[in-house]
Amino acid sequence: MLKRTPLFDLYKEYGGKTIDFGGWELPVQFSSIKEEHEAVRTKAGLFDVSHMGEVEITGTDSLPFLQKLLTNDVSTLKEGGAQYTAMCYEDGGTIDDLLVYKKAANVYMLVINAANIDKDVDWMNKHIKGDVSVRNVSDEIALLALQGPKAEAILKQVADHDLAELKPFMFRDDAAVGSVQALVSRTGYTGEDGFEIYCRNEDAACIWKLLLETGKDSGLVPCGLGARDTLRFEAKLPLYGQELSKDITPIEAGIGFAVKTNKASDFIGKAVLASQKEHGADRKLVGLEMIDKGIPRHGYAVYYQGEQAGEVTTGTQSPTLKKNVGLALLKKEACALDTVVEVEIRNKRLKAKIVKTPFYKRQP
């Protein structure tokens, strides 16, 4: 049986159409992917992302433990700060990409991808040294994402703190949304400004309804996984299983900024990632824009000078650009801007060119 989030019973009320997403029954859309995408880019959207995993790390050795496992430098995090990072195998392949929240000295929360929860927790448990506790709290926590240029104004009306003061990648874990206690962080996965709200399962419906009611006049709409994917894709935010995997390193995927090879602590995968950072990886994640008519899709082969150079990781018709575009992991010789390549679509090789990414960048 598919897993369900605490908000499942509300989906129908708002017109949600559900799909099987990695063993979860989640809404792919409420109105339409295009409308929801547009709302987040211009007004605001609300997502149920309660399927994401949360892991609590505590103990006096929690910092050295995280420094060993994660590619970013956790020692730079202050209380109330969040950091994007990756967890890698010794060969540099990616176990997961995740967020680390520092709640207090020796108290951290990791937010991990739903499909990777068991694998990630097993990996962490295998590497425990000293005074470290790893607790999977995924089933106790719901997560809502309020995203878009009007997100701040909407949240301001119902939150007890002035959350406008939160800078990106900062959070408050003593916030109240309506009458509900929550952790609110200025983070997201859309390329827009926004907030992620962590609360107890039993409080999720209350926050969901309150936000949608409060934001109605500002154009806030409920959004599904379809728009979440097109939004993150335009902003070139990687999705595990597509742009990142056990066979793709963070450097290849273009998130080298989250790999600190100069941090004082050694970490798993460092040798390979340091070499790729210094000398360049053999493959690179690049943007494609179709010249011929066709939409590049995940897994489609890409050819350069008659030979396969890699494949598409994600592709669609961009709702913002109104163009058929894709991300592709290609051999470095095929990656120069304006290089013409061919994408195999329905047994035909169609022309595309390498373009700049991200496809969309929010204007401050």
Swiss-Prot record:
HAMAP family linked to this entry: GcvT (MF_00259)
Protein's UniProt keywords contain Acetylation: no
Enzyme type, top EC level: transferase
Protein name: Aminomethyltransferase
Protein family according to the UniProt entry: Belongs to the GcvT family.
Subunit structure: The glycine cleavage system is composed of four proteins: P, T, L and H.
E.C. number(s) listed in UniProt: 2.1.2.10
Gene Ontology terms: cellular component: cytosol; glycine cleavage complex
Chemical reaction(s) catalysed: N(6)-[(R)-S(8)-aminomethyldihydrolipoyl]-L-lysyl-[protein] + (6S)-5,6,7,8-tetrahydrofolate = N(6)-[(R)-dihydrolipoyl]-L-lysyl-[protein] + (6R)-5,10-methylene-5,6,7,8-tetrahydrofolate + NH4(+)
Function noted in UniProt: The glycine cleavage system catalyzes the degradation of glycine.
Organism: Bacillus licheniformis (strain ATCC 14580 / DSM 13 / JCM 2505 / CCUG 7422 / NBRC 12200 / NCIMB 9375 / NCTC 10341 / NRRL NRS-1264 / Gibson 46)
Alphabetic keyword roster: Aminotransferase, Transferase
